[in-house]
Every structure is written in C-alpha cells, then in structure tokens.
Amino acid sequence: MSDQLPTIPADLKPADGRFGCGPSKVRPEQIAAVSDAATSVMGTSHRQAPVKDVVGRVRDGLSSLFSLPEGYEVVLGNGGTTAFWDAAAFGLVREKALHLTYGEFSSKFAKVTAGAPFLQDPVVVSADPGSAPEPTSDPSVDLIGWAHNETSTGVMLPVSRPAGSDNALVAIDATSGAGGLPVDISDTDVYYFAPQKCFASDGGVWVSIMSPAALERVAEIAATDRWCPDFLSLPTAVDNSAKNQTYNTPAVATLLMFADQIEWMNERGGLDWCVSRTADSSSRLYDWAEASDFATPFVTEPAHRSQVVGTIDLDERIDAAKVAKTLRANGIVDTEPYRKLGRNQLRIGMFPAIEPEDVTQLTRCIDHVVGELP
C-alpha cells in the first residue's frame, strides 16, 4: 500500500469489505454449493436431471420468494438484462412503449425500443439523475416500463399500475431491486432481473416473472410475421423454462449460486426478511450521511432513496476518488460512483448478503479516511 494512503485500523474494518453494486458480495456458502456439486452437476448435460433440477430450484424458489399469483411463470434465458431488453422489444412490445427514464439503466430499454425499426417511437418521460418521474400511462402505448431501482443513481421507484394502463403491460426492470425491495408481483406483468445484485451470483442470466397477460402477448406477437433471432425468442424461453431448461447452455455455476442464495433468503423469512435487512442497512448509511459535516445523500427525496444502492455526495473539499482508493487499498472495495454520473460521491451496495453492521463499520472507515487524508 502506498505510504501516502492512510491505514484503517483493523477494529474499524467491516468483516467483509465488498460493497459493490453488481457484481456484489457472494457468500462463502454459495461457493461451497458449487464445490459440493463439482462432480454431480458441474460438467454434465443441461438437458438432464442434475442441471434441470438446479433450474427447478431457482424457479420454485423465486415463486415462493415473490408469492407468485396464479398463472404467473418464472422464465429464464441467457444473456442478462441487456439481452432481455432486446428480447422484450422483439417479443413484448406490440407497437409502442412508454419508458420512465432517470438514469443510465432506465434509459437503456428506451434506447432499444427507439432503435427498433418495427416499433413506433416510444413515449419517454424523464427526470434528472437523483430524482424520479411519477409512473404514468398513455392510451397510445401497449407497454409501460421503468426501473424498480436505478443502479446508477441510487433511486428507487415503487411498483404500482399507473391509472389508465389497463391495455398496457407493466414491465419492471428489477435488476438491482429484485430480492431487496418490496413488491406485489400482481402489480406487474413483467418483473425482470439478473442474479448478480441481490441474488449474489454471477451475471449472464436473465429472469422474467411473467403474468398471464404477458404470456398471452408473447404468444400473440409470435403468431405474427415479426422476425426474431432464436437467441432472443421469448416463446422459446417460455417453452424451455417450463421444462426447467434454457435454450442454450447456461452457466451452471451461476445457477448453483443463484439457487443457494434464493433458498438462504426463503429460509430466513423470504422477501419480508430481505426488505427489512436492506432497510436496516440503508438507514444506517443515510442516517450517518445526514449527520455528517461532509457527506450528503445524493437523492434528496427520502422516499426515493434506495435501500439497496446508496449514493453519497462528499463535500467538494474532499476527493471522493481518493477516499475510494484508500478504502480499496485497505481491502474495502467497489465504493466508486457510477462512472458516467460524474459526481464527487461514493456508491454503496447494500444487498441482502451484506451485513448491516458492516455498513456501520464502513461509515466509520470513511470518517477515519476523511480525517486522515491531507
């Protein structure tokens, strides 16, 4: 470690120094679950029972975690949320979408539908980073989408069906919110996410919880002459998922870690337990920032401050990049802000795998570093 960077006393450090916003902290037990399956599951066919059973554990576990209503299905595919945006443009938007955008990731799906030559230009309702627009509807659209949690800015937006949206699917990007924020799945038609945030696994897989209306839309569009690459085909994903399979070979270790994390969550009380845990962690972070003379929550509206991704602005006299660098040199990693936001801030992951007490210790470390830096 450079002599110019302060050393953080051991008694201040968190038990685990991983605070990334995805990939996020992986529990040792998840790695052990992969090791335990080294010869029984790893390196075996994804069309046979051992791997299909793991996919089934993921699907059944998510059904329990989110208390799925009758007729909702857990659908899996390869490629992560980025691939799902393309799949949704091909297979869920009939003609025109409405997007709420308030950061880097909530804007990405809007860019996809805007660029799709077979769709009309979307309606885009925007808000500045750090704030969020009110969910709304438009009679001209057949899908309304927004992010449950905007990972780039630390803004969360509750999930509820906008008034007048009866003819539109409600599609929620829950990439960093699923498993850590409250949701009533019946308020959504498509609740999609990836496993590298709250579910403490690796990326490269997408999950979409689909309502009967969404499944009908998939079948409806599939019956038209709209071309779609097989890899992005939602009918193919729906059919394979019903068999506890994916269209092409999945990352089996990712699924093993994913399944273990879901079961860990359910064993402790399910989504209610997860939400209470992230509420505990985030209250520790925001209470500290509000009491600090150099730190301020970036999101000014308390109701929009994320329970899973905390963004904290630092006073201009303090170099946040130097603080993050010092933390990293002391084994406390991934507190840097989202690169494109360009703010003097820290960004802290507070997913269920992260111990609330470690968040408290992190704040003490930040105080120490700021006090020691020239």
Cite the ranges covered by each PLM segment.
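Active-site phosphate-binding strand-loop segment of PLP-dependent enzymes
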Residues: 126-179, 190
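Conserved N-terminal alpha-helix of the aminotransferase class I/II PLP-enzyme fold
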Residues: 38-87, 108-112
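Active-site C-terminal subdomain of aminotransferase-like
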Residues: 25, 196-286
